[in-house]
């Protein structure tokens, strides 16, 4: 699986950036 990994990493890396 790779799509799920990208989705999780994207969200985790976007969460703190959207602060």
From Swiss-Prot:
NCBIfam families: ErmCL_fam_lead (NF033690)
Coiled coil: none
UniProt source species: Staphylococcus aureus
Cysteine disulfide links: none
Keywords on record: Antibiotic resistance, Leader peptide, Plasmid
Record-given protein name: 23S rRNA methylase leader peptide
Function according to Swiss-Prot or TrEMBL: This peptide is involved in the control mechanism of the synthesis of the erythromycin resistance protein.
GO BP terms, alphabetized: response to antibiotic
């Amino acid at each position: 699986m790779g799509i799920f990994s990208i989705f999780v990493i994207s969200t985790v890396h976007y969460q703190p950036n959207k602060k």
